[in-house]
Each structure stands twice: as C-alpha cells, then as structure tokens.
Amino acid sequence: MNYDELKQIWAQKYDTVPQQLEKLKQIPAVATAFNTNIDAILKITGESLKKLITDNHITVDELTNIELSNFRKPTDVIIGIVKCFSRGIAEEWVTEDVNIYKWMETNLGYERLQMGGQGGIIANALALLGVNQVIAHTNSHPKIQAEQFLNLNNLMGIDENGESRKAYDISREQDIPLIHWIIEFDKGDSFQIDGKTFTCPKSNRFIATYDPLNMSLVINNGFINYLNTHPVQYLLLSGFHSLLESNSGVQLIKNAVPVLQRWKDNNPELLIHLEIASTQDKVVRKAIIDNIVPLVHSVGLNERETIDLLNILGQGALAERIEAETNSCNLFEAVLYLKKHLNVKRIQLHMFGLYMTIQDKDFIYTPEQNLKGMMTAAVVSSSKAYNGEIAKYDDVTKTLGMPVSNQGLNELTALSEMLHKKELLEAGVCEIDDFWLSAIPTILIEKPKTLVGMGDTISSVSLLAGR
C-alpha cells in the first residue's frame, strides 16, 4: 500500500475528531497541578544568537560538543541556547541565582507574555475545549498571572481567601510574578563563528527558568482543601521537574505524597496523569519515579524524557542507541521497558511525527478509544503550532483535514514491520506482550509559530478525549 492510500485511510480515521471534541464537554471537572507561571516568549535567529555570542566573548571551543545541562554563570544562557539550536533539541535549565534572571531580563527581553507551566497551559486548553469545570493550581496569582488565563467562566483558581473563583478575575497582589524565558528557533536557521557553521536541524526551544516558588513546590492550601471536598474526574500532574536535590527536592516530592494519597482516598474514581517533563536533576528524576509514579494511572513523555528515565534505570545502552538513532523502533523498545518497570497502567510517548500508547488490557479506555484521543490531540496541538495560540474554540481544528505527515508514516511503517504487526499501520492498534499498543501518524507543521506546551496539550487531550 502506497502513502497516498495510507493517508486516505488515516484521513478517514481523523474524521472522528469532531465527535471526540464533543465528548470533552461531558466531563464534569478536571484539576491541573502544580506549576503555573508566565512565559516570556522570544524567537531567536541565527544572526541575533551570533551577536549575543560575540558581545559576550564566547569562543567557538565553548560551543563545540557542549555537555553542560545547567547554569553556572549568566552567559551559560547562551551556551544552553546554542546547544539546543545546533542539535534541534528541547531542554529546560533551572537556576536559583537571581543574577542569571536579571541578565536575561537585560540581555534577552521578550516579544510577548503568555501562560506558562504545564498546569496553566493544560487548564487553558481544557477550559476552551469545553470541560465543564477546570480548577488550576497557582502558587502565585497576581493580576499579570491572571491575565494569562483565558477569560472563561469554567476556568477557576483559588483566591486570596482560599475560595474558588474565576481564574481571570483573581488578583493576589502580594504574590510575586513567576516568569520563564522560552527561546524558540527555526529549522534551517544558521550562524557562523570563526569559520564554523552552526545549523538548526529541527525547530525547537530552550527554556531558562528562575522560579523560586515552583522550584520549592509551594502548594496552595486552598487548592488542597478544595480537592479534599470537591471530587474531580481527572487530576493532571506536573511541576516536579524543576526541583533540585540541593534545594530539598527529594523531600519536597515526599511531602507531596500524602496530599496526593488523600485525594485518591477521598475519590476512588479519580484518574491521575503525570507529565514527566524535562527533569535535569538525576536524583530528583529518580525520586519522581520512586514516589509519584506509583500513585498515578498514566504517564506522558517525549523522546528526551524517555532517554533521561532510561539513564537512571540502568538502561544506558538503550538510551545511547536512541540518542544515536531516535526512531519509533528504538523508542518503542524503551517505552515497553518503562511500561513494565514502572508498572503504570498507561504510558504515552509523543515523538516527532508519531504518538504511541501502551496500556493495560483492563484500562478504562479501549485502545480504539485511546487512538481517537491521540488523533484529537494531534489536531489540537498542530492547530496550536499553526496558529501560534489557541484563544477561541474555532482555533482548535485549524488543521483538521490536513494529511498526516510522511515522517509519521515512515515511523509507523518501520514500527509495524519490526513488530510484524501489519494491522498497526492501517488500524493503529495491535496486541503486544499482553498489552495494547496504539499508534498514530501525526500532522506536522513545517514552520510552527510556537512549540510551547505541545507535549502537555498532547498528553492531556489524548487522555481526556479518549472517551
């Protein structure tokens, strides 16, 4: 079967997306926690990056074979940008040094502000998609933060009195704004330093974070009390990734366990999803696996996060293989290992051009339902990339009807051939090792206007739309 025929088959499958979007409106309540902040967006070009490098006297040797993954001094911001730019990868580095924050404020600036943090981004998306009530955790909610929430009556936060109110209207003026820099770059852009050319192989972004409250996992007591007394159907978790061992990160994770356990005990029907996110501190990464993962039903991750988990679970050889060849076959092997090792009911990977989920046979959704959820997420996330934002309901289906990508079909074909599961290529579902595997080719935007919050949107919409 040729790609034109396969694209037609998948186009017919994607026709179910409007029905799945309607099902989201049947969900009574969802909570998102714990990280909400403000993102300062900056699109950087090769030329402007070159100017930063020369103005700060950084040598070409410092930009070659970069192994650094955290900040030591302010100009390491530039090193991090070049690392991600030249490899087409996404990383988030965090700092407790206010001087680095001030350097970024002075030397980078920003083009616009928007909602940041997995919790906040997911809350906006799900409220716009029509979930009846979305309650978002904020540990800082001044007016500038409130303005990043959509002005929707079904989108709630906790006010200064510990009461639930429309998130857009809350103004906890005693709170400090939490601002992260999102530095985006485009595939094919390049710059030259001392005769060496650096070319970006894939559109992506570098995130530089100074966020004392989220880095200390400050949890709003009003939010805790609200979920203790108001059951929700889904809890979408994130925010552990910015913790540091040096800042009591492991103990902060352990402190969150009884909070989560009480929510589970009070609400046996609660379904909890954890978004792994880019966790640079290896000790914290292990603590998340040991303490938080056992409490959740579903986990979401991307290629980089998959490699990071493998490295701390003694699977360095497989991690290196994926680093060398980041493809669906190697990643499937990794996700299957993680599914078995973490013993979580559902695990979803979003990679370039393809999403895949491995789930228990007794999971509350069938693999066919999960497939529909992933296709819905592919439309919503690609529409966000195409549009730059999702500010009104009509924005969520901008890419509906666009063909699935050749990249996605390449990956799905290779995976189905490796597994000797022809049905995976056309049906998107097969049985493997007593689990269900579902996989879809996605819609890719050649020059996305934004990549912020893509993984979060994919994971949350995939899960909730798979009804």
List where the protein language model places each region.
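Ribokinase/PfkB-type carbohydrate-kinase core domain
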Residues: 1-457, 462-467
